[in-house]
Curated annotation (Swiss-Prot):
Gene Ontology molecular-function annotations: RNA binding; structural constituent of ribosome
Composition-biased stretches (Low complexity): 8-25
Region Disordered: start-end pairs: 8-27
Keyword Ribonucleoprotein: yes
Assigned GO CC terms: mitochondrial small ribosomal subunit
Protein source organism: Caenorhabditis elegans
Gene that this polypeptide is encoded by: mrps-9
Entry keyword annotation includes Transit peptide: yes
Assembly and interaction partners: Component of the mitochondrial ribosome small subunit (28S) which comprises a 12S rRNA and about 30 distinct proteins.
Keywords, sorted A to Z: Mitochondrion, Ribonucleoprotein, Ribosomal protein, Transit peptide
GO BP terms: translation
Protein name: Small ribosomal subunit protein uS9m
Entry's localization field: Mitochondrion
Family: Belongs to the universal ribosomal protein uS9 family.
Domain of life per record: Eukaryota
Amino acid sequence: MLRIVLARSSRAMSSASPASASDSDTSVRKIGKALETYLKHSQQHVAMMEKHRAEFETGRRHLAKMMSLDIHELDQEAIDRAILYLFPSGLTDPNARPVMRPPDEILPKFQRFTFDEEGKPEGSRFFTLSPKIYGLLSDIGVKTHSVMKFYDEHVGSRSVNRSDLEPANLSGSQWVTADKLKKKLSEKFSKELYGQVIIAFEHLASLPGSAIEQKFLMEFREPMTASTGSKLFGPAIPEVHVCAVTNRRYAEVTTRCKDTRATVKVTDAGKGKFDIDGLQLHDFRHLQAREILLAPMIVSQSLGRFDVTATTSCISNTLPEAPNKAPLMRSGGMSALPRAVRHGTALCVAALQPEAIEPLRLSGLLTLDPRKNERSKVNQPGARAKWIWKRR
């Protein structure tokens, strides 16, 4: 009987050993392929960076000859001035203008890992596809556990402030987008991983006592007005302030339209009043002017919610005149003044009411009108009009 049991056990061991050996060989092959792929990408990145550095130095020497400068005097500031001089551009977006910078500042950085003497990576997340995003998830989990422990220890004590036992205040901000998080971590990841990160952040922010991790949470959030900065032409959406006397939110911005400059202040929790250079809304006799002033309120569906205070001035009156001429008194015009106030009102309403940013932008109320009156030409009745030509 003992011989039969020993025989069966030996057969089982002999049959299991090849399977375990094959599994270990497969895992070793996978690890070897991962290391081989990493080393291959690392060598390709080093060769590419050396090539681009050599091209940058060659272009730098040619630029120094073109500008008649010594190569040692051509620093980055001189290069920027030379590019601006050689390639004048009227593009309003700075990211669309030509630049000449070292490849280390422009090209994406390669993520490097450290290995020990045996060639094994020191970080355990090396074998994951996204080590940094998994590290961020681990940090969120650790901080979630610490917040829960902190709240359980100090929930009934008076040794800490009550504000520390409340959830984090994240009003006026939103989580960074997937593209910005990829740039921040210098790593690519899937949409599913980004969704898991946002869910983990939301859970951490909703916990009582998460105010102690306010700084960590705000590192991955951005103001709601920051996302529309590159989409707007003209002044950006202003910041929201709180009045120390009335404890009401307000926003203030300065803008222009043609020859009129307007400084607009919009206060929340108001009654829909307008005060433009001491004039009320009913003081504007033209129906067009009233419609222009009320346009931001109609689009944002906030009639009667905000109070608008504006002061206007004519830009031409502030310009120096010739010494032998008397100063000219100009006015901003009947339509330019309401349009300037409308633009400032729309920007302030977008700051105080973030959910109305997209409707205001699609309506064109957040875009500055850069047009100006064309000057009159000599010996012509107007800017473009010509005298009627007669043969005799």
